[in-house]
Amino acid sequence: MALIEAFLLQGSPTGTILGALLLFLVIYLFSSSSSSQDKEKYPPGPKPLPLLGNLHILDLKKTYLSLLELSKKYGPIYTVYLGPKKVVILSGYKIVKEALVNLSEEFGDRDISPIFHDFNRGYGIAFSNGENWREMRRFALSTLRDFGMGRKRSEELIIEEIKYVKEEFEKFGGNPFETKLPLALAISNIIASIVFSVRFEYSNTKLHRMVGRAYENMKLTGSPSVQIYNMFPWLRPIVANRNQIVKNLRDTFKQNEELINGVMKTLDPFNPRGIVDSFLIRQQKDEESGKTDSLYNSNNLYCTVNNLFGAGTDTTVTTLRWGLLLMAKYPEIQAKVQDEIERVIGGRQPVVEDRKNLPYTDAVIHEIQRFADISPIGAPRQTTCDVHLNGYFIKKGTPVFPLLVSVLRDENEWETPDSFNPKHFLNKQGQFVKKDAFMPFGAGRRVCIGESLARMELFLFFTSLLQYFRFTPPPGVSEDDLDLTPVVGFTLNPKPHQLCAVKRS
C-alpha cells in the first residue's frame, strides 16, 4: 500500500498510523451517507475505497505518471480521490486550455493544500485567493514592471551575474562538477537584487543557507509522506518531512526579517530600490491614512517575498540544469547551437535582442522546457462556481489538477512527444514557431507572474554559457550513460550528476 510504504520510508511509527487509520475508517463508515446528487453528472473515475480513496492505485513517488496513466482509461476529464479528497484531473491540451484559458474565471482559484497553508496562511501571491490574491498579484506585477522585469534593467542584472557564473565554472578547469550550486547562487542573486536591492558574494554563508533550505523544501514538498499529510492533515505530528519544511521556512522568514530590517533603515520613500522598498512605502502610506484593513501588512510582505524567491529560483535553475545536461547528452545539437551563436553574435555578450536572429537556439531552449516538463501536474486550481466542462458537471470548490505533462507530451500536438527534438519549434524553412500547446508557465489568470523574467534568464544564461563553454560528460562516461530519469519533488529535477565545462577557443 502506498500509504503504509510512504511512512515506512520515513521511519514513522507505523503502529500508530495504522491504528489512527483504522479508527478514522470506522468513523468514516459510520458517518458516511449516500449523496443526494446525481453522480452521473460528474466525471468518471476509479472506484474509491472508504477514507483511502484511490491511494491503492497511485504511486506516490511518481504521482504525475499514475494520473497520466489513469487518463488513458477514463479520458481527458476524470475524478480521483486522494484519500477522502475528491479531485478532478484534466488531461490533454484541448481540455486544459478550455479550462485554464477559455474558462479562466471559473477555474481561477488556487486549491491550497495543508502544506501550502502551513507556508502562507492565505497570505502572499502563490497560495491565496480572493481580494488578497488580486491585490498582491497586482502589486507584484506593477512593481516588477517598474523595476524593469523583462526589460533593459533586468537584462543588465542578468548579464552582470552571468560574468560571475562563468568565473565559477572556469575555476573547475574543465574537470567534472555539479552545476546546481553556482546556478542556484546566480539566480538567487538576481531575485535578491530585484526584491531586496542587494547582491551576495558566492562565498556568503547566508546565501548558501537560503539556497539550501529552498532546495530541500522543494524536494520534501513532493515526497510521499507530505502528499499523505495533505490528504490526512491530522497526521501532522508524525510527518517528519512536513515538520522539517516548517522549520526551514521559519529560518528563512527570520533571515528575510533581517534583510527587510536592513532595507527599512535606508528606506527613501521617494526612491524605491526594489520590491520590498515599494511594499514598505505603500504600507507606510496606508498607516498614515489610518487605513485599518490594509492588505499591505507584514504577513503579506513575508509571504510575497518567499513566494517570489520560491517561484523565481528553483524553476529557472532546474531548467538550466536540464538544458546543460541535454547539451552534453546530445553534442550534435550543442554544436548546432554554438555554430549559430558564432555566426550571428560572434564573441560579444549575447543580449535579448539577439533572440529573433537565433531561431535554432530559441527552438532548443523551448524544447528543453517542454521535454524537462519540470512541473508536470501544474499548480492545483479550484473552481469558483458550478461549471460544466466537456459535458461534465464540476461543483464549486472542487480541486482541479491540470496535468501539464499531458499538454507538453500530447501526441496530437507534438510529432515526437517523448523525444528531445528542437524541430518541434521550427518550420520547414528553419524559422522559429511557437506552439499553443507550449505551457510550461501555466495558463490563464494564474499564469506565472515571472514568465518574462524567467524567459530572459533562460535565454541569456543558456546562450552565454554555450558561447563560452562546451559541456561534456565526465571522463569515462559516455553520452548514452547520462541518465535523463528525473528526481521527483515539487518539481522534476535531473538526477545528481557532474559535467565538464570546457572553455572554447
From Swiss-Prot:
* Record-linked InterPro entries: Cyt_P450, Cyt_P450_CS, Cyt_P450_E_grp-I, Cyt_P450_sf, Cytochrome_P450_fam2
The cofactor named in the record is:
heme
| A Gene Ontology BP annotation from the UniProt entry | aflatoxin metabolic process
| Record EC number | 1.14.14.-
Where is it localised? Endoplasmic reticulum membrane; Microsome membrane
Pfam family name, one: p450
One Gene Ontology cellular component annotation held by this UniProt entry: cytoplasm
How does the UniProt record describe the way this protein sits in the membrane? Answer: Single-pass membrane protein
Any one Gene Ontology molecular-function term assigned to this protein's record: heme binding
Q: Which segments cross the bilayer? A: 7-27
UniProt note on tissues of expression: Detected in liver and ovary.
Alphabetically list the UniProt keywords: Endoplasmic reticulum, Heme, Iron, Membrane, Metal-binding, Microsome, Monooxygenase, Oxidoreductase, Transmembrane, Transmembrane helix
Origin superkingdom: Eukaryota
Q: Binding of heme: at which residues?
A: C448
Q: What does this protein do?
A: Metabolizes aflatoxin B1 (AFB1) to the cytotoxic derivative AFB1 exo-8,9-epoxide. Does not show activity towards lauric acid.
- Which family is this sequence assigned to? Belongs to the cytochrome P450 family.
Task: State the protein's name.
Answer: Cytochrome P450 2K6
- The species this protein was found in: Danio rerio
Q: What lineage is this protein's organism placed in? A: Eukaryota, Metazoa, Chordata, Craniata, Vertebrata
